[in-house]
């Protein structure tokens, strides 16, 4: 039977399927212009869960499933600050507040043994084996391994959440001094049940098929004897090419610790090194916050500096970046401050006529405040572009979503009286509206707790809160005022003092 264009589009947009061994089915024509095939590879050790006769889909659920809608949501007070051109104003004069709602966290699990076993079959084997391990039992060996910093993005063509996490191998070193890091890639259905033994073929080359879960095949420079490999991996996707995600990370090379991008579903030219045009590379580049500007399918933007707002625009082909926007005097030294990169930025789920709006969760790093030498917490930031001008339309005080954060030293404790106390939002996987409008928005975020626990939770109410903000003043006078950062810094210190009193 000959299919017309509409029928072909319908078939290609259908979700992926579990298939019986040695069967394959054309399932998805991606935006890259190549066709993806889904295969399930037979294994003598594992059973395939579904049969081709039933063609059971991976999921019949949309990204907002009934489970997401009917989950228990708990209120969280959201307070923060909007811009002002008056440095003499009191912080309370421009401090809107509201209520958002979040679910309990859902912890994502992975097997350290499976991770180690898979790495021993790769080109990285020599990086993860020390001689003393020949006489060690497997339980003691696995104490040298950690997973952390899970980051997720929803891939519409796969109808699944694609999650990347950092894997650290310490060797005989301490937890803060790993020998090497890798990027683990997992696949989850809309309700975050892991999907295993899914093989995805995206080219006919020898390395053109991946089987989930797997280790991202990053080209790792062998520079030095520790801190090798990709660190702080984040995943993001351009809404205009929604099935072509990019993994962003920093990695040491022969020159510096630089920022890289990696496209896992491209048949070639997967890895790109980012550099700023006409500038000498800094010794250490990290914490770049990715986002995408409408109408720019061949570029990725980064918030390069959150204190002195600096925006980069980078080619995804060459990796060359230009400074698209710098607030204030480019030569002015604002200092590092407490603000660090966290999640990706995602666009507001409905469009504005005169501006572009993004939302994300950077993090604060507060030293010797409250209860710990170093406290990290996420905060909500709204970034706006009007014409060529960018500004922060809202910066919240720190958020913890009602979580008693796990102790840095013990899984059995939530004590904050330790060297570090860490909660960070690593990604916004999706942010979608039901037909009812802004009152029914659902956001999925991934969290990292104590740098050992990866989890996800759902958040409601951010769309309505952002829509109610005053974002009409794109005046360039706002670019020279640090008042919003000063007030957010004060609010952050007040938060950690209160948290310390309770923990």
Swiss-Prot record:
Membrane-spanning segments: 25-45
Membrane topology annotation: Single-pass type II membrane protein
Glycosylation sites: 468
Alphabetized GO MF terms: mannosyltransferase activity
Residue intervals on the Extracellular side: 46-503
InterPro entries registered for this protein in UniProt: BMT1 (IPR021988)
Observed phenotype of the null mutant: Leads to a size reduction of glycans resistant to alpha-mannosidase treatment.
Chief localisation class: membrane
Keyword annotations of the record: Cell wall biogenesis/degradation, Glycoprotein, Glycosyltransferase, Membrane, Signal-anchor, Transferase, Transmembrane, Transmembrane helix
BP-aspect Gene Ontology terms: cell wall organization
EC number of the protein: 2.4.1.-
Chain ranges on the Cytoplasmic side, renumbered to this chain: 1-24
Gene Ontology CC annotation, any one: membrane
Record's subcellular location: Membrane
Protein's UniProt keywords contain Transmembrane helix: yes
Role played: Beta-mannosyltransferase involved in cell wall biosynthesis. Responsible for addition of a hexose to the beta-mannose chain. Beta-mannosylation catalyzed by BMT4 masks beta-mannose epitopes recognized by monoclonal antibody (mAb) 5B2 reacting with beta-1,2-linked mannobiose as a minimal epitope.
Protein family: Belongs to the BMT family.
Record-given protein name: Beta-mannosyltransferase 4
